[in-house]
Amino acid sequence: MPYSTNDALPASIQRRLPPHAQDIYRAAFNHAFAAHIGDPRQEAAAHRIAWAAVKRSYLKVGDSWVKRETRH
């Protein structure tokens, strides 16, 4: 099911990720969920894709997710 707001995300995602990372997760999940209609693994695929999107912009350091530094 798509998430309309960050408050609708699973509690574990809300606890783990900072707000901007939640935005990335939600947008990627919703896009992937829509793209995989008819796939029996639709929700699982959407969660995997959403985590991959977060990991492109954030890095887990200890128990925290921190924004990756941009290279110029």
Predicted segments with their positions:
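C-terminal alpha-helical interaction appendages
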Residues: 1-72
